[in-house]
Curated annotation (Swiss-Prot):
Location(s), subcellular: Cytoplasm
Protein name, as recorded: UDP-N-acetylmuramoylalanine--D-glutamate ligase
Reactions catalysed, as given in the entry: UDP-N-acetyl-alpha-D-muramoyl-L-alanine + D-glutamate + ATP = UDP-N-acetyl-alpha-D-muramoyl-L-alanyl-D-glutamate + ADP + phosphate + H(+)
Annotated residues for binding of ATP: 115-121
SUPFAM superfamilies according to UniProt: MurCD N-terminal domain (SSF51984), MurD-like peptide ligases, catalytic domain (SSF53623), MurD-like peptide ligases, peptide-binding domain (SSF53244)
An annotated Gene Ontology molecular function: UDP-N-acetylmuramoylalanine-D-glutamate ligase activity
Major localisation: cytoplasm
Enzyme Commission no: 6.3.2.9
Similarity comment text for this entry: Belongs to the MurCDEF family.
Function statement: Cell wall formation. Catalyzes the addition of glutamate to the nucleotide precursor UDP-N-acetylmuramoyl-L-alanine (UMA).
Cross-referenced Pfam families: Mur_ligase_C, Mur_ligase_M, MurD_N
Origin superkingdom: Bacteria
Amino acid sequence: MTGQSVSGARVSVIGAGKSGVAAAILLAGRGASVLLSELGSLGEDEIERLRQCGVGVESGGHSERALDVDFSVVSPGIPPSASAVKALEERGIQLYSEIEVASWFCRARIVGITGTDGKTTTATLVHDIAAAEGSLRGNRAWGVGNIGVPFSAMVGEMEEGDTAVVELSSYQLERCVTFRPDVSVLTNITPDHLGRYDGSMERYAAAKFRICMNQKEGDTLIYNADDSLLEEHFGGGAFPFRRVPFSLEEPPSAGVMHDGVFLRDGEIVVARDGGERRVARTDGFLKNSFRGRHNIYNALAAVAVSEALGIGDGVVRDGLGAFQGVRHRQQFVRRLGGADWINDSKATNVNAMRQALEAVEGKIVLIAGGRDKGNDYRPVLPLVAEKVELLLSIGESRALLAEAFKGVARIQEAASLEGAVSLARAAAGEGWTVLFSPGCASFDMFRNFEERGDHFMQCVNSLEE
């Protein structure tokens, strides 16, 4: 399927989330006959808006009309086990993701970024650097995808010479078929969302690897060489595209390294075709909400992307120096009673929690918990034992966390996030850090990690001096 062949096609879009709605409007605008099919309910205003855009709408279930189509677009939140998905597959209907559909109409160069952790920060940083470079040439950079704005909602405004920075989840990549980024990035792969993949890391990784499955000569894959799974898969063998590893360690053969980005004595170094150049010092950009070992990885990835896009080192240095981090990722909230309060609501897995604990110096009151995803907390036990004075567990997993960290740190269960904030205020001493890094999903108490983080910040900012 291509953008030229959708006119007149009968299409269903399963799921009326943001990306599903955007895909439906895009396809209808390109001449397809589109039915947006939603299992839940839709508001009358939303239905009317969609109809004005030429989109047919049904809610409360999926009818025969949603199955009698030429192809279907499945929203990322719809699991493969959903009855509508199964019914479409049984009929041999081709299923696509919203990302795939948007790519058919994209005139901009595409940077696709995925990974378990770091993809939002890396995508935001790459976007900011590309936007600064684009402003010098009269072009634009667009931050879309899992970062918050659907690719399909913006693709019609993109021009040749623009840069689309697309953050991609494994869910969004599952139904990609022809999607081909000019530059793809794999930040890391650690256990997460395994329930969707029947507990299989292999299936989860395979979904992530789809980001580069269509890349060819002239395209670039950037990957974290310190991630053993990624290095094993991409470090050897033959691939049609250029591979650029990034690492905190200087390669033994750095002097003759063809392509790569690494850290040497606090400086980010780019190696290419036997030569190398220094781009930026880490002490020039690590600060406040953008600090820690994991953010050096994010910076390395962004530098590698910038090099692949031909962005000048001066623009890259300025972009790194100006970057303030992203909301809900180790975000400084305030200092109260001599203690720093940090919002890390985006830490929805154990590895992200580990990164936050590594980044904080001094004594910590840790607020953690939510909806557990089959987490293995053993990797963070040494850090918790070393740094955490009090662990306040919340949400569905509060008893599970209390058991997992029993004997490692002092633990207290809190009935709510507000209660945890009050307990943390009473416990935190001068020079301590109150770190909200849940390590779990948010869906037990909140719609998403953004709502959870906003609520935490509201609670903290309501505390009196």
